[in-house]
C-alpha cells in the first residue's frame, strides 16, 4: 500500500484528514466485481435443464477459481498480449435417466485483470475503463404545462434491465399507462389485469375521486357483466388478457425485468414503501403507490424530480460495466448449452463438450476492444493517467449521445459541489458530458457520489471526529457551508453570516444555523484544477484550459519542481504509480539503473524475524501510448536506510516524488517587434542549447513476414536494387542493430515479397521449377524510417512461433528514440490557460535583460492577460521571482481570500520586499510600480520606455509538437475515382482548395492561377504528367486538359440515362462530338 501524505485542509485542524487514494474508485470497483458481481451473474445462470428435463447442468459459483496469469504485467506489455487470468467454475452434469453424474472444474473463459495502477493491459497496450454516469433506476415525476396553462403529470419507472413503465395524466383528467413503446391503455385496465377490485384500488388512494373520469371512460367495457354487444366484450377481454400477459412477462418476472438494488432503494424511498431489497421486480403495491403519488401531484402534494440532480444519477464503475458484459456472455453460453443438450444424445455429452468458453471470451473481448467506455490510456504524463481513471462520462451504451444532449444536462448543478468538478471538462461537443471527480469525492454502495463534511454545532466545527460523507439527497436537508470559511484557533466560525447551500439554493445564513462545513477549499474541484496556484484569480474558462493543458505536458529531459505549487503535486505522483515506493522498511543493499535491492526484516507466521530481500525493477526508456518516454531513475543510494512508503525511484515527470511537468523560466510581459502578436511566444536560444525544454519521444514500428500465394515473404539483408548505404545498420539477418543512428528513408528491417511474373512462358516456369527462385522474382517491401523521423534504435524485438497470428511467419518490432528540442511552431502553455505558439528563437544577447544583467528567457504579450481575466499568472510569476531570489518554494492552497481581502497581493508584495531586502536589489520591489522593473533592450542596450512585469513562471511544453504536424507534398498518392490528391499527413496528402478559396481567387481575377490549381495541380492526369516532363526538361508548361472529376461527373449523369456529351463548336454549325475519355 502507498502511504499518502497527510494534508491539512483548513488551518488549525485538530484532526488531519487524508486525501483519499485517487484511483481507489477503480480498484475497489474491480475488487467488488471479483468478490460479489461475478458470483451474482454465475448464480443467475447456475442451473440449466434440457426440454425433456432428463439432463441437468449445475454450476457452483461460490467456489469459482482464478488461475494465476501466465505472464506478469511487464511480460504482457513486451509480448503484446493481454494480462488475463483463467476462470474455472465447479460444475455437475446429471443424467436423471441413468443417474450418471459428472463433476469437474469447467473453463469458462479468460477475464482481464486490473493492474495495481487501475488500468488493464489489452494486446500489450494500457487501457482504462471510464466511469459512466447515467440516470439511476427508480421512479421520476414530471409536470408539463401546455399553451393554455393546463397541467399534466407523468411518472416514469426506469429499470436497470427491462422495459420502462410510464403512467401519465392527460388534459382531460384521465390516467393512462404506457408500457415500453406500445399504445397506451387506461390505468383501470392495468388494475383489472393485476386482479385488483374497485375497493382495493380506492383504499390505496388518498384522492380516489380523481379516478372517476377514468372509470367512466373504461367501465362500460369492464364492469357490465350483461353486455349486449359481443364484439365489445371480446375486445375488452382481449385487451385485458394482452395487458395481463405484457405485465406478467415484462415487469413481474425477474428473468426479463430487474430494478436492481438501487432501483428498489429509490422506489421505496420516494413512495415510502417497505418492500424487501431482494424483490427487484415491480409489485402491485409499487404501481398503486405510484398512481397515488401521481394523483397527489394534481392536488399540489409531493415533489417533482430534477433529473439533473446527482441524487437521480449514479456512477457505473469498471466492475459493474464488466459484470454487465459477463451477463451478455453467459446469456449466449446458456443458449449454446441448451441447443447442444437438445441436439446431442444425453449419454454422449460431457462437461467439456457442453461448455464452450468462446461466448464469454468473445463478449469480454468485444467490450475491452471496441466499447466507447474502454479507452486507450492517456499516458502523456502522470497527471493525465490519474485524470483518465477519475473521468466521468455521460456517453456510451445506456447513456446520452452528444447530438441529443441539451444544455440542461451539460450545465453545472448545485448538487455537483464536492462531487463533480465544475471546471474540468473538454472544450467542444463533449463539454459538460465528460467531467472529472472532485478531489475528496467517493462512490457509495448504490453508485451515488458522496462528499465529506465536518459536523458543525453552535458555530463550532467539530474536527476531532471523522468527517461525515453525505449523499446528494441527504445534503439537501441541511445548511452546508463551503470549505473556505475563516475559522478561529478554536475551530469556530468567525463571521456572523456565512454563504451556505440549502435545498439547491446558494444563500446566506447565520453562523449558528450551519449544520455542516466542507473539509477543504479544494473540495469542489478536481485534481488537475487543484494544481493551479492562485486559481481564485482566474476566469473559469481559462482555468478549464489550464486543467486540460497540464494533461498534455510532455515529460522533459531535465524536469524542475515548480517554485509556486499547491501541495497536491506529491499526491498525484504517489497515486499515479509512476514513482517506486518502498514496501517494507530496510537497508538498500544494491542500486543500479534497472534494479534496487532492499534487505528488510520480516515476521513469519510463527513470530520469528527473518531477513528478506525485496527486488524493485525500474522501467527504462519504455514507450507510452502517446509515444512519450517512460523512464525511472533511482533516488536512493547503497547503504541508505529506508522506511515503508519512502520513494526509491522517480518517474519521467517527477522530482523527489513530486509532479514536475515544466520549467521555471524568467518571463517578461511586453511586446517585441510584433513577434508575440496574438498569443505568439518569443523565446531565448538558451532554452534550446541548454536542453531546458528537450524531451524524449519513442516511436514504434512493426513489420511482419507472411505466407502468400506465391510463397513466403522473407526477412533478409539481400534486397534487390538497394544502395549499400541504406543497409549499413542491418545485421546478417536484415534487422537493424540496437543503438544504430537512423535517418529518414533508412531500412530498419529488410524484407522481400515474391512477385508474380505476368509474362512468364511455360518453358520459363519449367526452368524456374528446376533452378529455383531468382533475385528478380522478388520485390522490395522493407520497413523504412518514415519521412521526417530520425533517431536512435533503442529496442528491437523478434516474435516467432506461437506468439503470432495465423499466416504470419515472423514479426519484428523496432523502437526509435528521438530527442526533440524546442523549436518554432511548438506549443507552450502556463497553468492558467495562457497558451501560445513559439514564433521566434532569439540569440540570448538580443533578449531584453534585467537591471542585474540577466537576460529573460521568454517574452509574452501583455494583452493576453486583461481580456482573458487569468490574473493568476501574474501573481504566480511575481511570487516565483521572489522565490528564486530567496531560494524558497511555496505551496499555496487555492482560495486564500478567506483570510481577508487582497491576501494574495499582500503575500506576493511582502515576499518581493523580502527579496529586495535580502539581495539589495531595489528594483525587485518598486513602490511606484510594484511587480514591475526597468528592462533593457539586448540589441541596443537602451532601456524600454515603460517598466515591465517580469517574473518566474512555470511553463509547460505541450504534446502538440510541430514535428508531428508539419507536412509538405510534391507528388504522392491520388484517389482512384476522382484522381485528386488524398488528404491528410498520414496519407502524404495535399492541401485542400475549397470553394471559399476558389471564390477568393475569382474575386482577384487570378484566372491562370485558378486554372492551374484546378487542373495540373489536382486531377488533370495527362496535364500533370506533361507538366512534370516540361519542368524536368526545362520547357514551357503546356496548356492544361480536362479534369478527371469532370469526366466522372459526365459518366455519373450518363449512368442516370441522361444523354450528355461534349461537342466541339464549328463555324459551319456542324458540331462534332468528342470522346473525352479518348482524346482529352
UniProtKB/Swiss-Prot annotation:
GO molecular function: DNA binding; DNA-directed RNA polymerase activity; ribonucleoside binding
Catalysis performed (reactions): RNA(n) + a ribonucleoside 5'-triphosphate = RNA(n+1) + diphosphate
Organism placement in taxonomy: Eukaryota, Viridiplantae, Streptophyta, Mesostigmatophyceae, Mesostigmatales
GO biological process: DNA-templated transcription
EC numbers, comma separated: 2.7.7.6
Family membership noted in the UniProt record: Belongs to the RNA polymerase beta chain family.
Family matches, as PROSITE patterns: RNA_POL_BETA (PS01166)
Cellular component, GO, one term: mitochondrion
SUPFAM superfamilies: beta and beta-prime subunits of DNA dependent RNA-polymerase
EC class of the enzyme, as a word: transferase
Source organism superkingdom: Eukaryota
Entry function: DNA-dependent RNA polymerase catalyzes the transcription of DNA into RNA using the four ribonucleoside triphosphates as substrates.
Compartments reported by the entry: Plastid, Chloroplast
Subunit structure: In plastids the minimal PEP RNA polymerase catalytic core is composed of four subunits: alpha, beta, beta', and beta''. When a (nuclear-encoded) sigma factor is associated with the core the holoenzyme is formed, which can initiate transcription.
Protein name, UniProt field: DNA-directed RNA polymerase subunit beta
Keywords linked to the UniProt accession: Chloroplast, DNA-directed RNA polymerase, Nucleotidyltransferase, Plastid, Transcription, Transferase
Gene3D superfamilies: 2.40.50.100, 2.40.50.150, 3.90.1100.10, DNA-directed RNA polymerase, beta subunit, external 1 domain (2.30.150.10), DNA-directed RNA polymerase, subunit 2, domain 6 (2.40.270.10), RNA polymerase alpha subunit dimerisation domain (3.90.1800.10), RNA polymerase Rpb2, domain 2 (3.90.1110.10)
Amino acid at each position: 500500500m502507498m502511504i499518502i501524505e497527510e494534508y491539512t485542509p483548513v488551518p488549525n485542524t485538530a484532526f488531519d484528514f487524508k486525501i483519499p487514494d485517487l484511483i481507489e474508485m477503480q480498484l475497489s470497483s474491480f475488487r467488488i466485481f471479483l468478490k460479489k458481481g461475478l458470483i451474482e451473474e454465475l448464480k443467475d445462470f447456475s442451473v440449466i435443464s434440457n426440454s425433456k428435463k432428463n439432463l441437468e447442468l449445475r454450476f457452483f459459483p461460490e467456489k469459482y477459481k482464478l488461475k494465476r496469469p501466465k505472464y506478469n504485467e511487464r511480460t504482457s506489455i513486451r509480448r503484446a498480449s493481454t494480462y488475463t487470468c483463467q476462470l474455472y467454475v465447479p460444475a455437475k452434469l446429471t443424467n436423471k435417466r441413468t443417474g450418471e453424474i459428472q463433476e469437474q472444474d469447467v473453463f469458462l473463459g479468460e477475464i482481464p485483470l486490473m493492474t495495481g495502477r487501475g488500468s488493464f493491459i489489452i494486446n500489450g497496450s494500457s487501457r482504462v475503463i471510464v466511469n459512466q454516469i447515467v440516470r439511476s433506476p427508480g421512479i421520476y415525476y414530471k409536470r408539463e404545462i401546455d399553451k393554455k396553462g393546463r397541467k399534466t403529470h407523468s411518472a416514469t419507472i426506469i429499470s436497470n434491465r427491462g422495459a420502462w413503465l410510464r403512467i401519465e395524466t392527460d388534459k382531460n383528467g384521465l390516467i393512462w399507462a404506457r408500457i415500453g413503446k406500445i399504445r397506451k391503455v387506461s390505468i383501470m385496465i392495468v388494475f383489472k389485469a393485476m386482479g385488483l377490485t374497485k375497493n382495493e384500488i380506492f383504499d390505496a388512494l388518498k384522492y380516489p375521486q380523481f379516478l372517476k373520469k377514468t372509470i367512466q371512460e373504461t367501465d362500460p367495457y369492464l364492469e357490465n357483466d350483461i353486455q349486449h354487444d359481443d364484439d365489445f366484450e371480446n375486445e375488452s377481454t382481449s385487451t385485458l388478457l394482452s395487458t395481463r400477459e405484457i405485465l406478467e412477462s415484462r415487469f413481474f418476472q425477474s428473468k426479463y425485468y430487474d430494478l436492481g438494488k438501487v432501483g428498489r432503494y429509490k422506489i421505496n424511498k420516494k413512495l415510502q414503501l417497505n418492500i424487501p431489497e431482494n424483490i427487484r421486480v415491480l409489485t402491485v403495491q409499487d404501481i398503486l403507490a405510484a398512481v397515488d403519488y401521481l394523483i397527489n401531484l394534481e392536488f399540489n402534494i409531493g415533489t417533482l424530480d430534477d433529473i439533473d440532480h446527482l441524487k437521480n444519477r449514479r456512477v457505473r464503475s469498471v466492475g459493474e460495466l464488466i459484470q454487465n458484459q459477463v451477463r451478455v456472455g453467459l446469456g449466449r453460453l446458456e443458449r449454446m448449452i441448451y441447443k447442444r443438450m437438445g441436439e446431442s444424445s444425453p449419454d454422449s455429452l460431457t462437461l467439456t463438450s457442453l461448455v464452450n468458453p468462446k461466448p464469454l471470451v468473445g463478449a469480454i473481448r468485444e467490450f475491452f476492444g471496441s466499447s466507447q467506455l474502454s479507452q486507450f490510456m492517456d499516458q502523456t504524463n502522470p497527471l493525465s493517467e490519474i485524470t483518465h481513471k477519475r473521468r466521468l462520462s455521460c456517453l456510451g451504451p445506456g447513456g446520452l449521445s452528444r447530438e441529443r444532449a441539451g444544455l440542461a444536462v451539460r450545465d453545472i448543478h448545485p448538487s455537483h459541489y464536492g462531487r463533480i468538478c465544475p471546471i474540468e471538462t473538454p472544450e467542444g461537443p463533449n463539454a459538460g458530458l465528460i467531467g472529472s471527480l472532485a478531489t475528496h469525492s467517493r462512490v457509495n454502495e448504490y453508485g451515488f457520489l458522496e462528499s465529506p463534511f465536518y459536523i458543525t454545532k453552535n458555530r463550532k466545527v467539530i474536527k476531532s471526529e471523522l468527517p461525515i460523507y453525505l449523499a446528494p439527497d441527504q445534503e439537501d436537508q441541511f445548511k452546508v457551508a463551503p470549505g473556505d470559511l475563516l475559522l478561529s484557533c478554536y475551530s469556530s466560525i468567525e463571521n456572523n453570516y456565512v454563504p451556505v447551500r440549502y435545498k439547491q439554493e446558494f444563500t446566506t445564513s447565520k453562523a449558528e444555523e450551519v449544520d455542516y462545513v466542507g473539509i477543504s477549499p479544494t473540495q469542489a474541484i478536481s485534481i488537475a484544477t487543484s494544481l493551479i496556484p492562485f486559481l481564485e484569480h482566474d476566469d473559469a474558462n481559462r482555468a478549464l484550459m489550464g486543467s486540460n493543458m497540464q494533461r498534455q505536458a510532455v515529460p522533459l529531459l531535465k524536469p524542475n519542481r515548480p517554485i509556486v505549487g499547491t501541495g497536491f503535486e506529491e499526491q498525484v505522483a504517489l497515486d499515479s504509480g509512476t514513482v517506486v515506493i518502498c514496501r517494507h522498511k530496510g537497508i538498500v543493499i544494491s542500486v543500479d539503473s534497472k534494479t534496487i535491492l532492499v534487505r528488510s526484516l520480516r515476521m513469519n507466521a510463527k513470530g520469528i524475524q527473518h531477513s528478506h530481500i525485496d527486488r524493485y525493477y525500474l522501467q527504462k526508456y519504455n514507450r507510452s501510448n502517446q509515444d512519450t518516454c517512460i523512464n525511472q531513475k533511482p533516488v536512493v543510494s547503497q547503504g541508505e536506510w529506508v522506511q515503508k512508503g519512502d520513494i526509491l525511484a522517480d518517474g519521467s515527470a517527477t522530482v523527489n516524488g513530486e509532479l514536475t511537468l515544466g520549467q521555471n523560466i524568467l518571463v517578461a510581459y511586453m511586446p517585441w517587434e510584433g513577434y508575440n502578436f496574438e498569443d505568439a511566444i518569443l523565446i531565448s536560444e538558451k532554452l534550446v542549447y541548454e536542453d531546458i525544454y528537450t524531451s524524449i519521444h519513442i516511436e514504434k514500428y512493426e513489420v511482419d513476414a507472411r505466407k502468400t500465394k506465391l510463397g513466403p515473404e522473407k526477412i533478409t539483408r539481400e534486397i534487390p536494387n538497394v544502395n549499400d548505404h541504406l543497409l549499413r545498420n542491418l545485421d546478417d539477418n536484415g534487422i537493424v542493430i540496437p543503438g544504430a543512428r537512423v535517418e529518414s528513408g533508412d531500412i530498419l528491417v529488410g524484407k522481400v515479397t515474391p512477385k508474380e511474373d505476368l509474362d512468364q512462358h511455360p518453358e520459363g516456369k519449367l526452368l524456374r521449377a528446376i533452378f529455383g527462385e531468382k533475385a528478380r522474382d522478388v520485390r522490395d517491401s522493407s520497413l523504412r524510417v518514415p519521412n521526417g523521423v530520425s533517431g536512435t534504435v533503442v529496442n528491437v524485438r523478434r516474435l516467432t512461433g506461437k506468439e503470432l497470428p495465423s499466416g504470419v511467419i515472423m514479426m519484428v518490432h523496432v523502437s526509435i528514440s528521438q530527442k526533440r528540442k524546442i523549436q518554432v511552431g511548438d506549443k507552450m502553455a502556463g497553468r492558467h490557460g495562457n497558451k501560445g505558439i513559439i514564433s521566434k528563437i532569439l540569440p540570448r544577447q538580443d533578449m531584453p535583460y534585467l537591471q542585474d544583467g540577466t537576460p529573460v528567457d521568454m517574452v509574452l504579450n501583455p494583452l493576453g492577460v486583461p481580456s482573458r481575466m487569468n490574473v493568476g499568472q501574474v501573481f504566480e510569476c511575481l511570487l516565483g521571482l521572489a522565490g528564486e531570489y530567496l531560494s524558497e518554494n511555496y505551496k499555496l492552497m487555492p482560495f486564500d481570500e478567506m483570510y481577508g481581502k487582497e491576501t494574495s497581493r499582500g503575500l506576493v508584495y511582502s515576499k518581493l520586499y523580502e527579496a529586495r531586502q535580502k539581495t539589495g536589489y531595489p528594483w525587485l520591489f518598486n513602490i511606484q510600480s510594484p511587480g514591475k522593473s526597468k528592462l533593457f533592450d539586448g540589441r541596443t542596450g537602451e532601456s524600454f520606455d515603460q517598466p515591465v512585469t517580469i517574473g518566474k513562471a512555470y511553463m509547460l511544453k505541450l504534446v502538440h509538437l510541430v514535428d508531428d504536424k508539419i507536412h509538405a507534398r510534391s507528388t504522392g498518392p491520388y484517389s482512384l475515382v476522382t484522381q485528386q490528391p488524398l488528404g491528410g499527413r498520414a496519407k502524404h496528402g495535399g492541401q485542400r482548395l475549397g470553394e471559399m478559396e476558389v471564390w477568393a481567387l475569382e474575386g482577384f481575377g487570378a484566372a491562370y492561377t485558378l486554372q492551374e490549381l484546378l487542373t495540373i495541380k489536382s486531377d488533370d492526369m495527362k496535364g500533370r504528367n506533361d507538366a512534370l516532363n516540361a519542368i524536368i526538361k526545362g520547357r514551357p508548361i503546356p496548356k492544361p486538359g480536362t479534369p478527371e472529376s469532370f469526366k466522372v461527373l459526365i459518366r455519373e449523369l450518363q449512368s442516370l440515362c441522361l444523354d450528355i456529351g461534349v461537342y466541339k463548336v464549328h463555324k459551319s454549325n456542324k458540331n462534332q462530338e468528342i470522346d473525352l475519355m479518348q482524346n482529352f
